[in-house]
């Protein structure tokens, strides 16, 4: 049995050999930025790079309308505006997600109603059905870590049955599919982040897609004014009268960011092909360890692998704590192994229990802390994650991560502990 690095043995690799570097800036990336610099660095409508990217992104998803914004959070904010969310409206949402899936709704005085997770960390359809009331106006979902929600079609059908909106946060899931249908096409409106670590990135940015012109018009007026609303909202629409001012905000993207995103987007299918090959390779290598539960890979899904989430089951690892397991992997040079901190359960966050302190104009009183999320609690308690590398020339890094995991896991099995 090879001595573990945490006990003074030789590491699998040096730390600087095991980083996840993203995005990869190429000569093509530099070229499109420089070209855009000499065209314009501010766009007031959907001309130029804005129109080009919006059309490509909409066509890729077979959607009619696309709208760029300055961040994924702003894009989600615009979805809530699009559905005319109001004070005391209830929105069903995942208790386990990044907070910005839910936090923008607090600017409308709405009430988030948290739903439990399924065994993949995505929102549970059973929980959705149980939490629905006559006050429910919408459901917002997240395809966590780039894994499509297994019951997304059931959720979409439920929304149609109840005549409520379905909003999709696809910020982790660019290009992901389930049953031959891309995420972001199941609901009434969907949002993607183009932030620096996202699969399609411009550094910062966001985009929404919809087939509903009324939803598009409201979102457009929220974050844009003058030229773009004037040219894209029909004069017969009551909203047209507000084109000059919009709703008072400016959430426009930056052309340089969208130039980068447009160049990156051209490689998305290649990115996903390589990521899925690496994810399958990692999964096959780790399946034999009873204390590791790998994410489900099925023939009817294409995951985008924003991250690869593993569940570490301490009681099956002879009581070795998750933190100690991760420390042993870090010691081998596997520096990207992570226990997520910024993404977790939302129900106890102060914004959702004591909004009265900072948003007293909308929430005069505290909100009761919602409880009863056993699946999500277990998922978060057991979760560790690694990135999935994206390029064929990174296969050696993937192999070293597999070797590091196997080294530590084999030690635990043979020695019944660590």
Summary of predicted features, one role per range:
Residues 157-165, 207-226, 319-320, 324-334:
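Basic phosphate/pyrophosphate-binding loop/patch that engages nucleotide-derived ligands
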Residues 227-238, 286, 325-384, 415-418:
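Conserved PLP cofactor-binding pocket of PLP-dependent enzymes
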Residues 77-133, 138-140, 329:
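Conserved PLP-anchoring active-site segment centered on the Schiff-base-forming lysine
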Residues 33-34, 57, 75, 91, ...:
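Generic structural signal for small/hydrophobic residues in well-ordered secondary structure
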Residues 173-179, 186-307:
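Active-site region of PLP-dependent enzymes
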């Amino acid at each position: 049995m090879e001595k573990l690095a945490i006990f003074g043995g030789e590491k699998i690799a040096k730390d600087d050999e095991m980083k996840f570097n993203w995005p990869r800036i190429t000569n093509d990336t530099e070229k499109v930025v420089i070209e855009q610099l000499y065209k314009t660095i501010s766009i007031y409508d959907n001309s130029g790079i804005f129109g080009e990217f919006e059309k490509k992104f909409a066509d890729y998803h077979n959607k009619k309308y696309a709208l760029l914004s300055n961040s994924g959070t702003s894009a989600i904010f615009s979805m809530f505006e699009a559905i005319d969310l109001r004070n005391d409206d209830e929105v069903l949402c995942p208790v386990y997600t990044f907070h910005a899936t839910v936090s923008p709704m607090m600017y409308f005085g709405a009430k988030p109603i948290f739903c439990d997770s399924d065994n993949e960390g995505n929102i549970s359809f059973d929980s959705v059905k149980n939490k629905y009331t006559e006050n429910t106006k919408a459901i917002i979902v997240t395809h966590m870590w780039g894994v499509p929600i297994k019951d997304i079609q059931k959720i979409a059908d439920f929304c149609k049955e109840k005549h409520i909106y379905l909003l999709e946060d696809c910020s982790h899931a660019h290009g992901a599919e389930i049953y031959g249908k891309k995420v972001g096409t199941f609901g009434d409106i969907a949002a993607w982040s183009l932030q620096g670590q996202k699969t399609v990135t411009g550094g910062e940015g966001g985009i929404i897609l919809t087939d509903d012109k009324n939803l598009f018009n409201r979102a457009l007026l929220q974050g844009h004014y003058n030229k773009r609303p004037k040219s894209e909202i029909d004069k017969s629409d009551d909203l047209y009268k507000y084109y000059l001012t919009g709703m008072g905000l400016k959430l426009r993207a930056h052309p340089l960011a969208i130039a980068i995103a447009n160049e990156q987007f051209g490689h998305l299918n290649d990115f996903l092909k390589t990521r899925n090959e690496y994810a399958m390779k990692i999964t096959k290598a780790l399946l034999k360890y009873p204390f590791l539960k790998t994410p489900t890979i099925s023939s009817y899904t294409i995951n985008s692998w924003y991250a690869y989430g593993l569940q570490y089951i301490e009681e099956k690892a002879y009581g070795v704590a998750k933190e100690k397991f991760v420390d042993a992997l870090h010691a081998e040079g596997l520096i990207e192994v992570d226990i997520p901190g910024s993404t977790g359960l939302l129900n106890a966050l102060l914004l959702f229990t004591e909004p009265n302190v900072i948003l007293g104009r909308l929430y005069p009183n505290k909100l009761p802390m919602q409880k009863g999320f056993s699946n999500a609690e277990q998922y978060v308690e057991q979760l560790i994650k690694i990135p999935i590398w994206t390029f064929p020339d990174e296969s050696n890094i993937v192999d070293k991560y597999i070797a590091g995991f196997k080294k530590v896991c084999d030690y635990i099995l043979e020695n019944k502990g660590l």
